Amino acid sequence: MALLQIAEPGQSASPHQHKLAVGIDLGTTNSLIATVRSGQVDILLDEKERPLLPSVVHFEQDNVIVGYEAAELASQSPQNTIVSVKRLIGRSLADVQQRYPSLPYQFEASENGLPLIRTSKGTLSPVEISAEILKKLTALAEKRLAGELSGAVITVPAYFDDAQRQSTKDAAKLAGINVLRLLNEPTAAAIAYGLDSGQEGVIAVYDLGGGTFDISILRLSKGVFEVLATGGDTALGGDDFDHQLMDWIVAQSGIAPQNAQQQRQLTELATQIKIALTDKLETSISYQGWQGNISREQFNQLIQGLVKRSLLACRRALKDADVSADEVCEVVMVGGSTRVPFVREQVAAFFQKEPLTSIDPDKVVALGAGIQADILVGNKPDADMLLLDVIPLSLGIETMGGLVEKIIPRNTTIPVARAQEFTTFKDGQTAMSVHVVQGEREMVADCRSLARFSLRGIPAMAAGAAHVRVTYQVDADGLLSVTAMEKSTGVQSSIQVKPSYGLSDDEITNMLKASMLNAKEDIQARLLAEQRVEAQRVLESVGSALSADQDLLNDEELSAVKNAIISLQRLQKEGDTQEIKQGIKQLDLATQEFASRRMDKSIRQALAGKAIDDVMKNAK
């Protein structure tokens, strides 16, 4: 709940003073900004009463142009006009060039391998370019609202990874924005529809924008928005529809673009055709002297594979949520690309119900963000609403033998913090390496490495005596922090996980499929690895004991122990799970008398020089 302000006597506390906060939908194609005024959320319009701001930035030597004017300059100066920068943010240059080989920009790599774009204004990063869009939006808001903003909620695709989310925050910081929270776009849409219609039950949020696709399965119950599962593709959207049209036009006309300017003109033509076919069954095309026609049915055939990709992600999300399509009460359509009739038809057929389109799909995310910003800034009590997002893949830690110990399972609601204790493996161990991994498999080699760090300064003790508490914390923005602390000394080390680039939906799906297909083999591999680790622990323990007290054994006994050691060493490398288990048992039998004598020796040393009465008193 919002905190009341307490003022000095004689001064007004102004407990109900309205703070200015906005929700920003930082989109791939267009961006919007919304706020709550007089209890109603609405989109802030620009000076020409337009709700959308094209996410396009044009750079000149002494000037930066954002929005419609920048978009008009795209054909004339494609290398200085950055379109769909959201696709680049938080990715490595290698990833960008692999995913988008036909971009007209002049790239170079930063020191850490991130993309930089050469423009007339200098070399700029996607973060700096995104900041220009955010500056334009906040300037518009402060002019319209006649005041300074207290903060903003900025939306991001549900599948943005830590690096992409952090880069979005960095862009906001450059733009001088106080980020109240990063909010998943489907969750923002759920806020908008949940408040407006008061729905309860399972809802699917189908979000197809210019550059990204997200599907979220949510349960709405008594004001609680719980995300049961998420899916999607960070490289699927309306831009891809345009590319299909562009390829078709080139194939039909036999005229390929010869330079960046012609490429940009072709892109603009494809977008115009797509929009025209939303309302018309057929439209004409004029391209570099070539005249032609294309029907909506032909367009549907071109994009059929892309729409099918989105529906496959829907099917996987339903399976993850453990619900069937007929359990979904409502389907919320988000993103400008859901205006395409074929998309609406296919989604309706898949879920067997007409999707909700009562809120403008271009505006719904910004409206939800605006509502959330109003709550977070303290203008509205939030006791009647709770948001629970989830993580898409399990987060774990590497343990001895290359095994994965899962700390936070997949589809756990966030924010969340989980902790687990680990012990040292060797005598005198003073450091521990922490390897953070992501995935569903049992072995580290089959999972995705996120980060590594070391905890040093652990007191030298016997193996297993030092206790290290490892805490995984995922905040409301989906950023992961890992802390390791040795309990007796309090010495600790931590890291914030920021992968250099993220996972696509296909990669996540492949990881999940692999975990199911290899479940039996993975368990067998884990059991074998665990026995090998246990064998190593026993061998080191016996070796340490022999170094200290070998004189307690006669030659025959020592020979038997050494033979059992040699046998276990061989089995550890070559044997199966049961053979190693049997080898450990044989070594245990061979050392039982040795262990008994060591215990007797230890007791004698402890009692040396002490009277019986003193020992009995201490025992009491």
Swiss-Prot record:
GO MF annotations, alphabetized: ATP binding; ATP hydrolysis activity; ATP-dependent protein folding chaperone; unfolded protein binding
This protein's UniProt keywords: ATP-binding, Chaperone, Nucleotide-binding
Presence of keyword Lipoprotein: no
Entry coiled-coil feature ranges: none
Keyword check for Chaperone: yes
Disulfide bridge positions per record: none
GO BP field: iron-sulfur cluster assembly
Pfam families listed in its UniProt record: HSP70
Family recorded in the similarity comment: Belongs to the heat shock protein 70 family.
Function: Chaperone involved in the maturation of iron-sulfur cluster-containing proteins. Has a low intrinsic ATPase activity which is markedly stimulated by HscB.
The protein's name: Chaperone protein HscA homolog
